Amino acid sequence: MLKDEVIKQISTPLTSPAFPRGPYKFHNREYFNIVYRTDMDALRKVVPEPLEIDEPLVRFEIMAMHDTSGLGCYTESGQAIPVSFNGVKGDYLHMMYLDNEPAIAVGRELSAYPKKLGYPKLFVDSDTLVGTLDYGKLRVATATMGYKHKALDANEAKDQICRPNYMLKIIPNYDGSPRICELINAKITDVTVHEAWTGPTRLQLFDHAMAPLNDLPVKEIVSSSHILADIILPRAEVIYDYLK
């Protein structure tokens, strides 16, 4: 393969890349979001400067990607922390677990999503929306909500989805020294909300050394939502360089 052909490739292996080129369109992307109150000292230990914490809140989320161009069907779960950067409110993506290798690869390589392999599920059990997250063979989170008890305003649902996402991009040199260390922003703007609901909600987190969601313990459920929407994943941009 010629050099000018090599540099045109998006990823490796050269003849079978880990993921295709975007844009990545999500049809009927299903969100189960729970905002809960946690310990402020615990948040201070994990939120990187220059992000600022407004309140001791965390959003636990499970998302079912039923139909994603180029990436297929998969489920994702994790924690996001409401923060602000230069006065702009958004969510710092703390950790994410999903069951799809192309989605893990594209999230880490083309952007800065903190994705690891995990086994989340989102399903309806009788009258209950259920979200679970397993790491390996162990359960680390169980979330439940009454199924479609109360309609949520579509504009409110859209506002939840369209908040800026702040992420860390860290890539070392081959000797382990810092090569890239950046704060990244990606904000979804292309979204169509089909349904939005809320209801009575509970969330359990369990201790795990390699999936430490419970380091941000649940003290009080603040709000919850169940949303179906079409979105297009945005491109990320660098907003802060730690090495300059």
Swiss-Prot record:
GO MF terms, alphabetically ordered: acetoacetate decarboxylase activity; identical protein binding
Effect of residue 116 to R: Retains 20% of wild type activity
Group of enzyme by EC: lyase
Induction cue: By linear fatty acids (up to butyrate).
Entry superkingdom: Bacteria
EC number: 4.1.1.4
Keywords from the UniProt entry: Decarboxylase, Lyase, Plasmid, Schiff base
Phenotypic consequence of residue 115 to C/Q: Complete loss of activity
Keyword Lyase: yes
InterPro entries linked to this entry: Acetoacetate_decarboxylase, Acetoacetate_decarboxylase_bac, ADC_dom_sf
Residues annotated as catalytic: 115
Reaction(s) catalysed by this chain's protein: acetoacetate + H(+) = acetone + CO2
pH dependence: Optimum pH is 5.95.
Task of the protein: Catalyzes the conversion of acetoacetate to acetone and carbon dioxide.
NCBIfam families xref list: PRK02265.1
Subunit structure: Homododecamer.
The protein, known as: Acetoacetate decarboxylase
Species of the source: Clostridium acetobutylicum (strain ATCC 824 / DSM 792 / JCM 1419 / IAM 19013 / LMG 5710 / NBRC 13948 / NRRL B-527 / VKM B-1787 / 2291 / W)
Source lineage: Bacteria, Bacillati, Bacillota, Clostridia, Eubacteriales
